[in-house]
Regions:
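N-terminal cap/lid segment of alpha/beta-hydrolase-fold proteins
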Residues: 30-78
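Short beta-strand element of the alpha/beta-hydrolase
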Residues: 77-88
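The serine-hydrolase catalytic nucleophile loop
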Residues: 90-102, 116, 305
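Conserved alpha/beta-hydrolase
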Residues: 103-123
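Alpha/beta-hydrolase active-site loop
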Residues: 129-150
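Alpha/beta-hydrolase-fold enzymes
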Residues: 170-251
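Short beta-strand/loop motif that positions the catalytic acidic residue
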Residues: 287, 293-295
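Catalytic histidine-centered segment of alpha/beta-hydrolase-like enzymes
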Residues: 326-338
Length: 353
């Protein structure tokens, strides 16, 4: 029992869910030519239907890989509203971010979702650096690219962040006023959780973990070692005993039902120096754009959405929309909850873009 409790504490602190035992679902992405793992994913580009286009561009010297979704009967000579979509921590563009990108494209939008720099299919070394400044720049770079895409009306640009991508979307929108309407789904405040633990469960070890992160950076600079967060293999039995839905259901989503080989929650330990001093809810008063924050009524991560929403004091148009009965992870895949979120997003973007 003591071992199980220790593993749960580690997972709550770093959300380090290992995907090494996800072979049973990797066959699904292998069957999809775009390696998409969500239900109803595009399997081929058909004229007159929603299409997917894999694109690349640079952030400094790093190659970023993204998917652009174009709506049915896309005509490059026309003008379309575009939505930038930021994926969850450890996630990739082929999972929930791709699902929402496709569903919004079905509503007539051009959408883009990219793998974060140093992660997924994108370039950058050391692998799996996970720093807030990078994630925010990923969002700004998606806006740069999609604003120049044929058919996009750059004056009508929306932003959607999911889970950790939601926190970074809030930060990006504070300064980048190209984004005219801001939305999040199941927002996760990465810095607060990396610092304090989920629901403040790891406050006692803050200084210890900062020491470890500092030591890891010193090793990197000396060229001796790239140190990563612990790579714990979580079994189904262990997951079932976890006290929080977010981590219990997250295990099944990322390791079983929607696993992708590019998705991993392992990241460089030195990243904690940046993560633990970040708070997505800081400077929320800088957001003056319309704001929609969506979360499940049963999400144990809801406190993060509520906190950020309450701090958004300078937008005259904001709404906190709860999906009745949904948990955090269920907003990633469960058809009835995804449909509620997409319908709300479509209405929000239609009115505000």
């Amino acid at each position: 029992m003591k071992k199980i409790v220790s593993i749960i504490a580690l997972v709550m602190s770093i959300a380090d869910i290992n995907i090494s035992n996800a072979q049973t679902t990797q066959k699904d992405q292998k069957q999809n030519p775009y390696t998409l793992v969500y239900e109803g994913a595009i399997t081929e580009n058909v004229k007159g239907k929603v299409n997917i286009h894999t694109v690349t561009y640079k952030i400094k010297e790093i190659t970023i890989v993204a998917n652009v979704y174009t709506p049915a009967n896309y005509d490059a000579s026309k003008k379309y509203t575009a939505v930038v979509i930021a994926h969850p921590n450890g996630g990739v563009k082929e999972q929930v971010a791709g699902l929402y990108a496709q569903r919004l494209a079905e509503q007539g939008y051009i959408t883009i979702t990219a793998d974060a720099a140093y992660q997924g299919g994108s370039g950058g070394t050391p692998r799996n650096i996970d720093k807030p400044a990078n994630r925010i720049e990923d969002i700004l770079a998606m806006a740069d690219f999609i604003s120049q895409y044929q058919g996009v009306d750059s004056s009508k640009l929306g932003l959607l962040g999911i889970c950790g991508g939601g926190g970074y979307a809030l930060s990006a929108a504070q300064s980048d006023k190209r984004f005219k309407a801001i939305a999040t789904v199941s927002m996760f405040n990465s810095g607060v959780v990396r610092r304090n633990g989920f629901m403040n469960s790891q406050v006692a070890t803050i200084q210890e973990r900062l020491e470890q992160a500092s030591e890891a950076r010193a090793l990197e600079v000396s060229g001796k070692e790239i140190r990563y967060t612990a790579n714990v293999v979580i079994t189904d039995e262990m997951a079932d005993k976890m006290p929080f839905d977010l981590y219990r259901e997250g295990h099944y989503y990322y390791n079983r039902t929607h696993a992708h080989p590019n998705s991993t929650f392992k990241y460089t330990m030195s990243s904690l120096m940046d993560l633990m001093t970040f708070d997505a809810s800081n400077n929320m008063d800088l957001i003056n754009q319309p704001l929609l924050m969506i979360a499940g009524s049963k999400a144990d991560s809801f406190y993060m959405t509520e906190d950020a929403f309450n701090k958004a004091t300078n937008t005259k148009n904001k709404e906190l929309f709860q999906i009745d009965g949904a948990t955090h992870i269920q907003t990633y895949w469960k058809p009835e909850y995804v449909s509620q979120a997409v319908n709300k997003l479509q209405h929000f973007y239609q009115i505000n873009l």
